[in-house]
Amino acid sequence: MEQLLRAELRTATLRAFGGPGAGCISEGRAYDTDAGPVFVKVNRRTQARQMFEGEVASLEALRSTGLVRVPRPMKVIDLPGGGAAFVMEHLKMKSLSSQASKLGEQMADLHLYNQKLREKLKEEENTVGRRGEGAEPQYVDKFGFHTVTCCGFIPQVNEWQDDWPTFFARHRLQAQLDLIEKDYADREARELWSRLQVKIPDLFCGLEIVPALLHGDLWSGNVAEDDVGPIIYDPASFYGHSEFELAIALMFGGFPRSFFTAYHRKIPKAPGFDQRLLLYQLFNYLNHWNHFGREYRSPSLGTMRRLLK
C-alpha cells in the first residue's frame, strides 16, 4: 500500500510514525510526506469508498462554517483487492479535557449556524436590493444531507424531508429496525416498534425545529483537543434536530460536565427534552445492535418500553 500512497500523494517521503491505530470500523496510520504529516484511514469493506466519501462531505460541510475544527480531508484512494484509504490532515491530538467547555460553545454555535442564516435571509427579504449570491452560505430549509453518510459502516439515507419527525422515524429508526428484522427477526422489537412509531409525533408537539448541521456521531472517541483548541472528527453529518447530537454524548460518558453546561448556556433545554433524548438514544442502541450484536438488544428494547410508558 505504501507504493500506492507514494504515487497518489506524489511524495518521495513516506515514513510511518507512531503506532498503527484501530478504531471500531477502520484502521489508521500517520505518515510523514514531502508536504507534511498526514493520517491515513484504511477500510477493506466493499462500501469503503462510499463511507469515506460521506466522511469527506461531512468534514467539508463542518469546515465551511468556520465554527469547529476538523481535520482537512485530502483524498480517497481505491485499494487493490477492494476497500479504500482516506488521507487527511494529521493533527496531534489528546483526549478532551481542558477544552471541553470551549467545545460545548462551539457545538452550540454550529447548531445555531443555519438558524442564523435563516434570520439573515429574512432580514434581506425585507431590504430593498438584490440578495447576495454565489459563494455565500445558504440557509437549508429541509432535513437530510446531499449525500449518503455512514454511522459506523451502515449507510444512512439522507433524502431531504420537510419535517423532522418523518425524517428521523423513516431514515434513522425504521432503517435500523429493518436491518434488525433482516438479521434477527426479533418479534419483540417488531411489536414494540409498531406501538412506538405512532407516538413519535407526540414528542414534538409545539416544538419548532430549525434544521441544524450536525456532526452526527459525537461520542467521546470522536472528539479531542490539542494546544490550539478542541477538534472533532469521524463525522456522519446531516441537517437534523440539534438535540440528536447530545444523545450519544450522554450515553457513553467521556464528556466533562463543563461541555454540557457551556452548550446549554447557548441552547437551553426545550420542554420534553428528556423524553426526546431517550428517542435519540434508541437510534444509537439500535445502531450498536446492528454493529456489535445482541448485547445491545436489551438496552434497545428497554428504551422502547420506557418511551411507551
Swiss-Prot record:
What's the family?
Answer: Belongs to the fructosamine kinase family.
Q: Which Gene3D superfamilies does the record cross-reference, listed alphabetically?
A: 3.90.1200.10, Phosphorylase Kinase, domain 1 (3.30.200.20)
As stated in the Swiss-Prot or TrEMBL entry, residues carrying the post-translational modification N-acetylmethionine are 1
Please give the name of this protein.
Fructosamine-3-kinase
This enzyme catalyses:
N(6)-(D-fructosyl)-L-lysyl-[protein] + ATP = N(6)-(3-O-phospho-D-fructosyl)-L-lysyl-[protein] + ADP + H(+); N(6)-D-ribulosyl-L-lysyl-[protein] + ATP = N(6)-(3-O-phospho-D-ribulosyl)-L-lysyl-[protein] + ADP + H(+); N(6)-(D-psicosyl)-L-lysyl-[protein] + ATP = N(6)-(3-O-phospho-D-psicosyl)-L-lysyl-[protein] + ADP + H(+)
Domain of life of the organism encoding this protein: Eukaryota
Give the E.C. number(s).
2.7.1.171, 2.7.1.172
Q: Where does ATP bind?
A: 89-91
Q: GO molecular-function annotation terms?
A: ATP binding; kinase activity; protein-fructosamine 3-kinase activity; protein-ribulosamine 3-kinase activity
Higher taxonomy: Eukaryota, Metazoa, Chordata, Craniata, Vertebrata
Relate the protein's function as given in its record: Fructosamine-3-kinase involved in protein deglycation by mediating phosphorylation of fructoselysine residues on glycated proteins, to generate fructoselysine-3 phosphate. Fructoselysine-3 phosphate adducts are unstable and decompose under physiological conditions. Involved in intracellular deglycation in erythrocytes. Involved in the response to oxidative stress by mediating deglycation of NFE2L2/NRF2, glycation impairing NFE2L2/NRF2 function. Also able to phosphorylate psicosamines and ribulosamines.
Q: Does the keyword Transcription apply?
A: no
Catalytic EC class:
transferase
Recorded GO cellular component terms are: cytosol; mitochondrion
| Tissue expression summary | Widely expressed. Expressed in erythrocytes.
- Active site location: 217
Q: Which UniProt keywords apply?
A: Acetylation, ATP-binding, Kinase, Nucleotide-binding, Transferase
Q: Which GO terms fall under biological process for this protein?
A: epithelial cell differentiation; fructosamine metabolic process; fructoselysine metabolic process; post-translational protein modification; protein deglycation
Which proteins does it associate with, and in what oligomeric form?
Monomer.
